Regions:
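A general structural signal for well-ordered alpha-helical segments in protein cores
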Residues: 12, 35-38, 80-84, 197-202, ...
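Short arginine-rich
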Residues: 227-237
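Residues embedded in well-ordered beta-strands within globular domains across many folds
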Residues: 54-57, 96, 139, 159
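Basic phosphate/pyrophosphate-binding loop/patch that engages nucleotide-derived ligands
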Residues: 17-25, 39-53, 118, 142-146
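Beta-strand-loop-alpha-helix segment that lines the small-molecule cofactor/substrate pocket
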Residues: 1-33
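C-terminal glycine/acidic-rich active-site capping loop/insertion
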Residues: 31, 144-219, 240-244, 248
Length: 248
């Protein structure tokens, strides 16, 4: 099923709770789960290269195409929400969002979304279809290094920057310590030349053969819809945080 799974969390939950017959496979097309660049970033996070991950910053912008049936939250943000859940391997505790309405009869043209995870990790998502530049970026900030995923940069999809913030003794009267930047080299790791769509299709075929649910299954699709709905609700409340209580 093409993402998002449904146009509301309730409809997605109904699908997620639908009793599948033995052997039935239900997959939602969250393609970035199968992007070799995103999966390399995830490996860097969990092998300790970045240290402790503090936050993610995601940008998905372009000048169009504009939709009138749904807001930019439901149109563009599913990708970045999916990436965030994949990288952090869990659900946020709360969501807040603000949205701008600039075109005539617009359901929402630009949005700034913040996901707060139980461990304090943050994800900031900027989505827009009224931006002059097409950008598809994810920055992962860790205590030891940071990594950028840039889907528009074919030869440099992932770049690791060995830069850390260090606490050093301070002799200033303005604080007991100060932060300094320790800069190191930048590394461009090898990314296997795999096509995400092909990888997604192969995952589906594998699930059919093994009769096991795929990585982006119906429950995953529901959780993403729950986050999108919470973001839209927060935007209507001028950015008030909305708690997430996914039921599956």
């Amino acid at each position: 099923i093409e993402k998002p799974l449904a146009n509301s969390a309730a409809a997605a939950l109904e699908l997620a709770q639908y009793p599948l017959a033995d052997g039935q496979i239900f997959m939602v097309g969250h393609i970035f789960r199968f992007h070799p660049g995103i999966n390399r970033v995830r490996e860097l996070m969990y092998e300790g290269t970045l240290g402790t991950t503090r936050y993610l910053h995601c940008v998905r912008t372009n000048l169009g195409p504009v939709r009138k049936d749904v807001s930019v939250i439901w149109d563009l943000a599913p990708h970045d929400v999916s990436i965030a859940l994949h990288l952090f391997n869990g659900m946020p505790a709360r969501v807040s969002a603000t949205m701008g309405y600039y075109l005539q009869n617009s359901p929402g043209d630009v949005a700034f979304i913040t996901l707060t995870f139980p461990g304090g990790e943050l994800v900031n998502i900027h989505v827009s279809w009224v931006d002059p530049q097409k950008r598809r970026e994810v920055d992962v900030i860790g205590t030891n290094a940071l990594v950028r995923f840039d889907d528009m940069n074919v030869g440099e999809t992932v770049r690791i920057v060995q830069r850390a913030l260090l606490e050093v003794p301070s002799y200033s009267t303005f604080g007991e310590f100060q932060l300094v930047t320790h800069a190191g080299e930048s590394v461009i790791p090898f990314i296997p030349p795999k096509e995400p769509l092909k990888e997604q299709c192969q995952e589906f075929l594998k699930s059919i053969q093994t009769r096991q649910q795929p990585l982006s299954d119906v429950r995953d699709g529901y959780r993403i819809c729950a986050i999108l709905e919470a973001a839209a609700a927060s935007a209507k409340q001028h950015g008030a945080p909305v708690n997430i209580e996914a039921e599956v």
